[in-house]
Each structure stands twice: as structure tokens, then as C-alpha cells.
A protein has these predicted regions:
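Bacterial N-terminal signal peptides
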Residues: 12-24
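N-terminal leader/linker segments that initiate helical-solenoid repeat arrays
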Residues: 27-86, 94-97, 103
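Amphipathic alpha-helical scaffolding segments comprising HEAT/armadillo-like alpha-solenoid repeats
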Residues: 41-57, 79-91, 112-126, 147-160, ...
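Alpha-helix N-cap/helix-start positions at coil->helix boundaries
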Residues: 60-64, 95-97, 132-133, 164-165, ...
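Alpha-solenoid HEAT/ARM repeat scaffold
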Residues: 64-68, 96, 100-104, 136-137, ...
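Alpha-solenoid repeat junctions
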Residues: 74-78, 106, 110-114, 142, ...
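Alpha-helical adaptor scaffolds
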Residues: 211-214, 235, 239-265
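Terminal, low-structured helical/coil segments at or just beyond the last alpha-helical repeat
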Residues: 297-334
Length: 334
């Protein structure tokens, strides 16, 4: 079942939720201090401008519950509001907080099977708005959605943005989408993340992406890109690329192991070498023991680390999570 099928199946429940959000009595609003309370929604406020006015007033509330309600309000109301009014309000808004609200509403329309150009407008502003805080806000609005399926090479462009804030938000989107939308099991999402990481000239962004995504579904081209990053001038990038290689699909494991074994002897950073040992162990399980034994003399300071891996791998545990747990237990016992 596709994401679009699920979206259409959920339309009825979305409408019910929207109506409940628009109900006159809002319990969250009651939690606000009297000075911060906004009036209950009235029929006249159930318009784009009415909702925006309510949100502007309410965002100063001391009640976090009320602000959470406001964050959901416009997004969940999006399918009932005129698309042209919503888009026009988005285009003329320059307060980053309100931009994020409006962008999330437009994204929601596309996610729920309505006009695709709604999300396209958000993506275009993320790429082209002159204000980096606005660009960052629109990127956050696309987080944990299917945006990467509809926006082409947007993320490869965003990770090269002049603003560090924008680059960081783009990297966060890629990681959170990979883990929380696709569960690390979507090849397109994984390959998009790797392509963006390789395209970035910001070592922190590249490391953030490669060090956190799941790479079990990446294609051969993505594996080659990760292998090339093992030669990066940044130790942080080399360590993250090493971690990413440890999780590649079975068809790419031999190539990944060969790359890591070939780079280990020339690597000078102990943290990167330690990451390489872990990925070699992960790629080979018990079959990695002879390789680890041959590496033992390269760096005497890491001999205890290698010995710990060898001891755990010789237990023939069949789950990586169990291997990690036992390795941690051995380290704590030392």
C-alpha cells in the first residue's frame, strides 16, 4: 500500500479531527494563564485570515498545551480551507514561525491527496527565499513527510545553502525521514540522503547524515559515494562514512569490508580506526575474526578493543544488537 493510498484512507478521520480542533471549547486553551487566553474559535474565525490571527495571538501564551494545539490547528484545517487563500497567505508571510505554520498546511494538502503544487510552492521557497530563517522554517515544515519523493534534487541543493542553519535543518530532515517515515527500509530515501551527504561541502552536515541514517537499502552507487568519503580530510566525515558502510546491504558487504580493511592501516585518527573495527565486525560477524587478528599489530593502543570484538564475535551471536550489548558488557567489566 502506497503513502497516497494511506492518505486517502485517512481523509475521513482527518476531517473529523479538524472539526474537533475547530470546536468552540478547547481544553488546551483553558490551561493558559488568564492574561494569555485567546477566545474560543467562532465561525467567523474559521477562515485562513481568522485562523492566522488566532495563531498570532496565541503563540505568546505561556501554555505549552495551547501552543501545541495551535501548531496542529492550521495543519489539520488545511484540507477545508481554500487552497488559493492558503497559498497567498504563505507567499506574503515573512515571520518564520507563521511561515512554518503555513508551509505545514500546504504540505498537508499534498500529503492528503490534494494539489501537488502546494508542496512545490513550499520547496521553491525553501530553495529561493532571501531570508535564511524563512528557508529553514519551510524545511522544518517538510520534516517527517513524503517531501523527498516529490522534490527531486532539492536536498542536494539545500545542503549547499550558504546558511549553516538551512544546511543543518536539511540534514535533520533527511535523517528523521529515513528513520521515522521510512524506517530505514526505503531505497530512494536512503539514496537521497547519501547523495545529499556526498554533495555537501560542510563536514558537519555530511557527518550528521551518514552517521545517523540506516543504509540497509542503499544501492551500489551510494556505496561508492560513501567509500569515496573515507578519503575525506575531515576525521568526522571519515568516521561517519565508516559507520554508514557497516550497515550496507548483503550484496555490498564484501566491497565495504575491503574498503575498510584497506584504509585502516593508513588511518591516523584513533576514533576513526575504532569506528572501522566496529564496522568490520558488523559486516563479517564471526568471519571477521581472522581479519581483526591481522589488524591487531597495526595500532597497539587498540589491541584491547580488537580483543574485545574477537571475544564477542566468537560467541557466534546471530543478532547485531546482541553483539553490541555483549561488547558493552565486556567494556564495563574491564
Amino acid at each position: 500500500m502506497t503513502r497516497r493510498d494511506l492518505s486517502m484512507m485517512n481523509m475521513t478521520s482527518t476531517l473529523v479531527l479538524t472539526l474537533s480542533l475547530l470546536a468552540p471549547a478547547v481544553s488546551a486553551a483553558g490551561e493558559a494563564a488568564s492574561a494569555d487566553e485567546a477566545p474560543a474559535l467562532r465561525g467567523g474565525l474559521c477562515s485562513v485570515e481568522g485562523l492566522l490571527a488566532k495563531i498570532r495571538r496565541g503563540m505568546g501564551s505561556k501554555s505549552e498545551a495551547y501552543k501545541r494545539y495551535l501548531r496542529a490547528l492550521l495543519r489539520e484545517s488545511a484540507v477545508l480551507l481554500p487552497a488559493s487563500e492558503l497559498k497567498a497567505a504563505f507567499e506574503r508571510e515573512y515571520d518564520p514561525v507563521m511561515v512554518e505554520h503555513l508551509a505545514a498546511a500546504l504540505v498537508a494538502r499534498t500529503e492528503r491527496g490534494l494539489e501537488p503544487e502546494a508542496m512545490e510552492a513550499v520547496a521553491q521557497r525553501a530553495l529561493a527565499d532571501r531570508d535564511p530563517s524563512v528557508r529553514a522554517a519551510t524545511i522544518r515544515a517538510m520534516r517527517r513527510t513524503g517531501a523527498l519523493e516529490r522534490t527531486g534534487n532539492m536536498y542536494e541543493r539545500l545542503v549547499r545553502d550558504p546558511s549553516p542553519e538551512v544546511r543543518k535543518e536539511a540534514a535533520t530532515n533527511l535523517v528523521e525521514d529515513n528513520l521515522n517515515v521510512y524506517g530505514g527500509r526505503d531505497a530512494r530515501a536512503a539514496d537521497t540522503a547519501v547523495a545529499a551527504a556526498a554533495a555537501s561541502s560542510d563536514p558537519q552536515v555530511t557527518a550528521q547524515i551518514l552517521g545517523k541514517i540506516m543504509t540497509g537499502e542503499v544501492g551500489a552507487e551510494s556505496v561508492r559515494k560513501i567509500q569515496q568519503l573515507l578519503s575525506s580530510d575531515s576525521a568526522e566525515v571519515r568516521a561517519a562514512a565508516t559507520t554508514a558502510l557497516g550497515g550496507v546491504p548483503a550484496a555490498e558487504m564484501a566491497s565495504a569490508r575491503e574498503s575498510l580493511l584497506g584504509m585502516y592501516r593508513g588511518e591516523r585518527d584513533p576514533g576513526v580506526r575504532k569506528a572501522m573495527l566496529e564496522s568490520i565486525a558488523r559486516l563479517g560477524f564471526s568471519s571477521a575474526v581472522p581479519e581483526l587478528q591481522r589488524l591487531r599489530s597495526v595500532d597497539p593502543s587498540l589491541a584491547p578493543e580488537i580483543d574485545a570484538w574477537i571475544r564477542v564475535l566468537n560467541m557466534n551471536l546471530q543478532e547485531w544488537s546482541l553483539i553490541l550489548r555483549e561488547k558493552q558488557r565486556l567494556q564495563q567489566a574491564r
